């Protein structure tokens, strides 16, 4: 009998996942459907369950705060997600998230194990039969200081910052280490009051509680200081190589607990959970800013401070995370490491880890859906393994094209193009390469959308990487900051010739910013960042036949087996999901071409 499990995550990066007998049918973020960046509350995504099944065996909910404490509907006493699932007929009306024993419920609330869900997502997609998971995240599950009163407010709460778990099949996850951060102070706190009910039963090897910002919250504080939104840490990462060491800054991270752990210096970084922490500008007057002007218009001193502080937080944070990786291996003896949580999207840090881990023969898997959307995957897979006890080791997730399978017809393509005043003509790879080498931007739209924040050839903007001013040109068209780097997609068989892969066989998820091999940078200047690195995606014919063939054609003409690749969106917008999203983006920008390789068609917008 087929088992259907639907899972949702409710916070920012909200999304939904559907499993059929343990395999992903689709995984989608709410923002792709609503067109609102970082949208939460995945009500639109939930309705998509009905496209595949009229009934769920389980609806699993992930977040950072239990359903019982949030999202309540007046009068009914229930939550909006259970209510919607009942309204759609996906679950039985007699069921309740608040009735019966945990194992008998149809609605399963896993919001109390946020970090464990990040770990489960990474472990089940790593290909390892056992592993140790490190989760480095902003603010995970909210846990009240006093379990008896259960008060949920900023004075009584702590939040997960960094966690270590041992992982094994079918559902063997043990919490070994956890750093809980908060605003404090916390007088007279008993350690056994802090973990969630489920995790307290497991016991801990080590639990840290303090009133400081965690690794990610400190990074977010610097991100905010640099003029960005706290969730835009990727911009800080891109800005960091423009900075340099600066002796006038204090260290961001310092010893805590008599040197037993490292934490953000609360004199420099002030925690403001559950929001981002803030840089203490009043204590360090030379850091004070007078306005929130863009990085292109602020005074020279502030610009230098932002660049140098970005450099500092990147360097220091990756050193701290590396220490935690070694701590995880030391605690378990397991040299299979999986990394997840928001920090795992830091491709500069991920590459930094490889050098040190290779010396100790430690294998690293970095989960490509490490944002909170990944907790829905973790929740669904954990529920599947808990109910079936399936011990079969899952294979490495080489591809993450996990969106919907749209069934467009030629008439659909023509109708959508006509609505925006665009034309549709026949096209093949040779013609697309001619456009690219003539310094045209060409977008590509095909198949299922990519899961996670990286475009991997199904929803991508493409350009010629050999064009010297390509980075500035495309950043201007996408309306992005000048310092934002771009990625490259390369034929796997040539990857080691062009980049130092640090022993990796492939990099299909674009999770590492790699050093170029000698003499390479000048050949592909558009995708080489100021520090000489490039975030790359390796491509095989088996992973993406159409995209591979296009890169192969580009290689034949240019002797460069790489295409400039960036996400198909404009600044501040989500990745395009539907063909209409794609054509609308052309209409609202200076881009003119969208290639549909499955149909051999090219949509052209005369802008």
Where are these regions (language model features)?
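Flexible beta->alpha loop and helix N-cap segments adjacent to enzyme active/binding sites
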Residues: 4, 9-36, 75, 79-82, ...
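Conserved active-site "lid/cap" helical segment
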Residues: 14-15, 20-105, 243-312, 324
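Glycine-rich phosphate-binding loop signature in dinucleotide/nucleotide-binding domains
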Residues: 53-54, 128, 328-333, 438
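Short glycine-rich phosphate-binding loop at a beta-alpha junction
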Residues: 54-67, 333-342, 443
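Short, surface-exposed connector motifs at secondary-structure boundaries
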Residues: 103, 330-337, 360-363
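Short acidic-aromatic active-site loops that bind/stabilize oxyanions
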Residues: 109, 208, 212, 299-319, ...
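Phosphate/ATP-binding catalytic cores across multiple sugar-kinase/actin-like superfamilies
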Residues: 311-335
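A general "terminal functional-core" signal
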Residues: 316, 344-346
């Amino acid at each position: 009998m087929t088992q259907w499990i639907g899972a949702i995550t409710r916070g920012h990066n909200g999304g939904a996942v559907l499993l059929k007998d343990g395999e992903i049918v689709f995984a989608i973020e709410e923002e792709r459907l609503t067109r609102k960046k970082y949208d939460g509350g995945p009500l639109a995504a939930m309705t998509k369950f009905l496209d595949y099944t009229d009934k769920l065996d389980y609806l699993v909910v992930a977040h950072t705060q239990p359903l019982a404490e949030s999202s309540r509907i007046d009068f009914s006493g229930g939550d909006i997600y259970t209510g919607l699932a009942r309204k759609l007929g996906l679950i039985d009306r007699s069921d309740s998230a608040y009735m019966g024993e945990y194992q008998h419920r149809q609605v399963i609330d896993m919001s109390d194990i946020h970090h464990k869900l990040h770990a489960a997502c990474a472990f089940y997609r790593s290909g390892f039969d056992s592993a140790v998971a490190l989760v480095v995240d902003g603010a995970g599950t909210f846990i009240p200081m006093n379990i008896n009163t259960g008060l949920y407010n900023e004075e009584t709460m702590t939040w997960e910052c960094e966690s270590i778990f041992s992982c094994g099949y079918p559902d063997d996850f043990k919490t070994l280490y956890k750093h809980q951060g908060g605003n404090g102070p916390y007088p007279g706190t008993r350690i056994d009051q802090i973990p969630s009910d489920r995790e307290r039963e497991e016991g801990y090897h080590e639990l840290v509680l303090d009133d400081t910002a965690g690794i990610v919250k400190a990074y977010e504080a610097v991100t905010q200081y640099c003029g960005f939104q706290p969730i835009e840490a990727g911009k800080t990462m891109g800005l960091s190589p423009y900075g340099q060491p600066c002796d006038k800054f204090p260290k961001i991270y310092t010893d805590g607990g008599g040197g037993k752990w490292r934490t953000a210096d609360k004199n420099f970084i002030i925690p403001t959970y559950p929001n981002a922490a803030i840089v203490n500008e009043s204590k360090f007057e030379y850091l004070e800013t007078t306005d929130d002007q863009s990085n292109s218009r602020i005074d020279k001193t502030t610009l230098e401070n932002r660049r140098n502080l970005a450099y500092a937080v990147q360097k220091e944070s990756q050193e701290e995370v590396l220490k935690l990786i070694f701590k995880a291996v030391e605690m378990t003896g397991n040299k299979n490491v999986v990394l997840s949580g928001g920090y795992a999207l830091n491709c500069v840090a991920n590459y930094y880890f490889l050098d040190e881990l290779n010396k100790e023969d430690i294998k690293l898997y970095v989960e490509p859906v490490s944002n909170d959307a990944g907790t829905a995957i973790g929740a669904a897979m954990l529920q599947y393994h808990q109910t079936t006890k399936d011990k079969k080791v899952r294979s490495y997730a080489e591809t993450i094209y996990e969106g919907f399978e749209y069934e467009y017809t030629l008439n659909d393509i023509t109708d959508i193009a006509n609505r925006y005043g665009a034309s549709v003509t026949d096209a093949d790879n040779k013609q697309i390469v001619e456009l690219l080498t003539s310094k045209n931007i060409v977008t590509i739209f095909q198949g299922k959308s990519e899961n996670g924040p990286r475009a991997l050839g199904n929803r991508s903007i493409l350009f010629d990487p050999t064009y010297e001013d390509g980075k500035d040109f495309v950043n201007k068209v996408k309306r992005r900051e000048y310092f934002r780097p771009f990625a490259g997609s390369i034929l796997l068989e040539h990857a080691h010739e062009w980049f130092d892969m640090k022993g990796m066989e492939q990099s299909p998820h674009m999770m590492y910013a790699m050093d170029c091999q000698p003499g390479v940078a000048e050949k592909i200047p558009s995708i080489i960042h100021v520090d000489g690195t490039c975030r790359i995606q390796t491509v095989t014919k088996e992973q993406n036949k159409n995209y591979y063939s296009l890169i192969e054609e580009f290689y034949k003409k240019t002797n460069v087996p790489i295409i400039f690749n960036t996400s198909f969106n404009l600044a501040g917008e989500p990745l395009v999901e539907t063909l209409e999203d794609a054509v609308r983006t052309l209409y609202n920008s200076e881009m003119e071409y969208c290639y549909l390789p499955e149909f051999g068609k090219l949509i052209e917008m005369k802008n």
